[in-house]
């Protein structure tokens, strides 16, 4: 990746990462420059304020945000568009999480971040990847970055569902949640293993 190249070349300074499809508004570069001057080593994310998608996709996207928050305790409203300092390269490149999902890797490795809010612009290059299949794959990769946290949270959810099953004298709920979370954890660990192996 470009970040690996910058690390190899021992680049010193600020780094801005953005997509080249037109959706990351270059007009906000000025805001990034101004914000970065306050604390050059503080990571900055550009959080999107709106999405121009069809209603069913918006609903599904909000469901994904809720599910990912439930499992990871992270609410990710930003994508690739971001700023980080060269001093942060060692941390973000210390694992292969960046190959799963760059935004999730930022959220995992940098707890304290500055935020700039900006709408997503219309795509000018390439076809939109906003479909149900790509969203599902994207969500799995995002959550896979936090797979260890997800496993812990899943165990807690299984325990809570076990207690609930005792209260309502039914084991169906407990069994369903147990199997669903078991299957889900296997999927995200396999996905992470596959991508880590390829890098």
Could you say what each language-model-derived stretch is?
Residues 50-54, 75-85, 107-115, 136-141, ...:
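Short flexible/disordered coil segments
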Residues 1-6, 14-17, 23-100, 122-133:
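Acceptor/aglycone-binding surface of glycosyltransferases and processive sugar-polymer synthases
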Residues 90-149:
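Catalytic donor/gating beta->alpha subdomain of glycosyltransferases that bind UDP-sugars
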Residues 151-199:
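Membrane-embedded multi-pass helical conduit in multi-pass membrane proteins
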Residues 16, 44, 114-116, 191:
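Hydrophobic/aromatic beta-strand patches that form the interior of the parallel beta-sheet core
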Residues 43-46, 70-75, 110-111, 141-146, ...:
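Short, surface-exposed, polar/charged, turn-prone segments marking secondary-structure boundaries
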Residues 52-60, 132, 136, 143, ...:
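Structural motif marking the loop-to-transmembrane transition
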């Amino acid at each position: 990746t470009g970040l690996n190249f910058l690390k190899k070349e021992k680049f010193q300074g600020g780094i801005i990462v953005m997509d080249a499809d037109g959706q990351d508004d270059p007009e906000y570069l000025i805001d990034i420059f101004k914000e970065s001057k306050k604390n050059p080593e503080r990571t900055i994310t550009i959080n999107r304020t709106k999405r121009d998608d069809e209603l069913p996709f918006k609903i599904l996207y909000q469901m994904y945000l809720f599910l990912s928050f439930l499992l990871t305790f992270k609410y990710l409203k930003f994508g690739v568009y971001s700023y980080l300092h060269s001093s942060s390269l060692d941390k973000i490149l210390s694992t292969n999480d960046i190959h799963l999902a760059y935004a999730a890797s930022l959220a995992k490795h940098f707890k304290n971040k500055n935020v700039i809010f900006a709408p997503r612009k219309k795509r000018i290059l390439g076809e939109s990847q906003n479909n149900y299949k790509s969203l599902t794959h994207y969500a799995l990769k995002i959550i896979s970055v936090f797979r260890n946290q997800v496993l812990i949270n899943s165990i807690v959810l299984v325990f809570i569902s076990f207690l609930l099953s005792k209260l309502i004298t039914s084991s169906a709920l407990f069994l369903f949640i147990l199997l669903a979370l078991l299957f889900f954890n296997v999927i995200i660990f396999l996905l992470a293993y596959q991508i880590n192996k390829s890098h």
